[in-house]
Amino acid sequence: MSVNKKVEIRDEFITLSQFLKIVDLVQSGGEAKSFLLSHKTLVNGESEDRRGRKLKRNDHITVDGQEYEIC
């Protein structure tokens, strides 16, 4: 899997909602909920629609074909 963008975190984990805000795909948690229902989002190859999903280092996220890695 080729990763196009790396997202660095300071804490042990971030939520999927926080991730979407960091990469400027949404502005708020409510917007994240709607976004996840209408955009194909994968975490480590599995479909995900929970905005509270914890993302840790080395997780791979794909949003509408754009790939990211948490580091």
Language-model region placement:
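A basic, amphipathic helix-loop patch mediating RNA/tRNA/ribosome contacts
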Residues: T15-R57
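A detector for short, charged/polar N-terminal pre-domain segments
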Residues: S2-I14
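A short, structure-level motif marking secondary-structure boundaries and short turns
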Residues: M1-S2, V43
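A positively charged, amphipathic N-terminal helix/segment that binds anionic biomolecules
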Residues: K5-K6, H60-C71
